[in-house]
Amino acid sequence: MHPRDQTIFALSSGRPPSAIAVVRVSGAQAGLVLTTLAGKLPAPRQASRRLLRDGTGQPIDDAVVLWFPGPASATGEDVAEFHAHGGRAVLAALLAAISVIPNMRAAEPGEFTRRAFENGKLDLTEAEGLDDLIHADTDRQRRQALRQLQGLLGNRARDWRERIIEASALIEAGIDFSDEGDVPAELRAPAVKAIKALHVEITEVLAAQGHSERLRDGMVVAIAGEPNVGKSTLMNQLARRDVAIVSPHAGTTRDVIEVQLDLDGYPVTVIDTAGIRETDDPVEQEGVRRARARAEDADLVLWLVEGEQAADPASMRSLWTSGDGSHPSGGSVWIVRNKIDLGEFGDEGPQGEFGISASRGDGIRELVDALVKFSAEFFGTSEGALVTRARQRDLLRQASDSLRRSLELVGEGEELAAEELRSAAYALGRLLGRVDVEDVLGAIFQKFCIGK
């Protein structure tokens, strides 16, 4: 029996113990599972309280069951759900009772969602939105993922694809007239108009995305500087907990330490790095190497100095493996003066420099406010973004390029223009997951948890 013909089951809720646990079953045997464990089938889409029994008649649990006959279900197949008590022993007995029923097997990661995709319940962009929603850590990530799940990009892509196919039909119909002379204007003109409009729409979407793809992974901020200037103390202040060891001894931080922050809904990864200095200690040398590598990839570097100490350009240049002290990948660098409680310095100094006391917390609120403002500018207009993944951007760019080439060719050779339109429609079909996407399905659905 093909794996997709088997009925699958899995725990779909969180790890036990819990108050309630949900076990989901999908496939042709879902109804049999319900009747075997709970007696007769309940009314579709209505909760029913049942005493669950295993194959020998032994009671398992007093639970709520639901029945969703396909295709009107989440996966498009027959689906059964058991809402049982979330104790480990209860779930072990329930899953064991299901597993011994013929043609049953445990679901693989993301398999319920993959079956929903294969049965037309959602397209690939919506599946990606679901994946993002499951992994969202901040409210802005949640809102962006939910819009994708609700079809923000998928609906537009379907409309574009249908219009491309209509324009292609006009062009190809004109080819039939080629033996009799030029393609009739009543066929070419509306096709060209439609192609121009489509090209403009897709190009505008690509141009307006800003850092929307980055909202999924977040912005990276590296705290860097010479040893023992308070980098780890600042890290703990930003995290509001002790995540880094603080010591008066220089070189305490040997490895890169990361913490995930939610700054007004913006996902930010803050990195505490080893102090930048020349050293003979091989372990510290490796820490410095890693610090430089992560700082070079950061979107923003907070270069920490002590009080009124000048920000030594040579020290800052030493942070990068090459260059003149500016960020090698175009990121921003802020000077943050620590230990202002030991000298005269305001909350914010010249040229956007910040004054803080990491040990007392002075100036931290102002620094965080500046980070929130920087995050808003960095992520830009990602609130209504259509494109949230590199895969989506690449396929939209392919479609846009094909539309542009079709416009260039439509007056020279209708066959070539029609071929470019087919390429554009094909790219959008891949975007939606409707053509030739087997190579990406595994990569997407394997990231889902088991039971989803």
Swiss-Prot record:
Domain TrmE-type G per the UniProt entry, residue ranges: 218-376
Localization per record: Cytoplasm
Molecular function in Gene Ontology: GTP binding; GTPase activity; metal ion binding
Function of the protein: Exhibits a very high intrinsic GTPase hydrolysis rate. Involved in the addition of a carboxymethylaminomethyl (cmnm) group at the wobble position (U34) of certain tRNAs, forming tRNA-cmnm(5)s(2)U34.
E.C. code: 3.6.-.-
Descriptive protein name: tRNA modification GTPase MnmE
Stored Pfam families: MMR_HSR1, MnmE_helical, TrmE_N
Cofactor annotation comment: Binds 1 potassium ion per subunit.
Sorted UniProt keywords: Cytoplasm, GTP-binding, Hydrolase, Magnesium, Metal-binding, Nucleotide-binding, Potassium, tRNA processing
A single GO BP: tRNA wobble uridine modification
Residue numbers binding Mg(2+): S232, T253
Subunit structure: Homodimer. Heterotetramer of two MnmE and two MnmG subunits.
GO (cellular component) term, any one: cytoplasm
Cofactor: K(+)
InterPro entries: G_TrmE, GTP-bd, GTP-bd_TrmE_N, GTPase_MnmE, MnmE_dom2, MnmE_helical, P-loop_NTPase, Small_GTP-bd
HAMAP family: GTPase_MnmE (MF_00379)
CDD domains, per the entry: trmE, TrmE_N
